[in-house]
């Protein structure tokens, strides 16, 4: 039991050290160097952070409390957390904390938003600086609400006239660029005014090994060259081979029974040879005569 109590006590260092030529003397607060006999124990102080109304009362009593105020205004269609943070010189995390935002998309579910700014500053003293840019500036309403200063929140940077004008100029440039006619087209081309525009060269129709013809034209040409022309070629030479005469004479039968040979060019004319004609009665032979013969 004694050992547990000794272990529970914290070590207490010497309050002073006296050096002598032969030794060192350590002086403690209770006059003894034994840590087990020390009756003092280290106390750990835990500071609890108050919340709710008690936190507001304590924060109002501290010096510097009430230096932050909430600026409440109606939201426009083009507003975003980044734009509001740049415009009013605060942090996006402070805006989320003041409006209990979990995500940035929660902004579009509200009609008005609270923005933390410094009290007695340029943004709170001048109403013109509180109005947003664009057409929705006339509908802006400003309400000042006391914001208790948080211990963890750091001090916001001081807002000057030059910084305000700088962000105001950025917003004006963005607004002008959105409503300009340059971005209404499908593509945006920025060129120098004195730059000469080269004529557009039309792509040739013939491309590749087929010279740009259609597929059915290619099939027709292949059929014509591979089938039709060879058939005509064979028919022509067949006709030429069968049309040549076998002899150099042309025989003509004359009705009177003689045959006349017409002269052929390059040969001597010949006489006509008479051919005897038999009467019709002699040409018929009776069966009895043929049997007797």
UniProtKB/Swiss-Prot annotation:
PROSITE patterns: LYSM. Residues 71-115 form the LysM domain. Glycans are attached at residue 30. Residues 236-293 are cytoplasmic. Its main location: membrane. It holds the Pfam family LysM. Disulfide bonds: none annotated. Keywords: Glycoprotein, Membrane, Transmembrane, Transmembrane helix. It is found in: Membrane. The chain crosses the membrane at residues 215-235. One of its GO terms (cellular component) is membrane. It is a single-pass membrane protein. Residues 28-65 are annotated as: Disordered. Residues 1-214 are extracellular. InterPro entries: LYSM1-4 (IPR045030), LysM_dom (IPR018392), LysM_dom_sf (IPR036779). This is LysM and putative peptidoglycan-binding domain-containing protein 4. It comes from Mus musculus. The lineage of its organism: Eukaryota, Metazoa, Chordata, Craniata, Vertebrata.
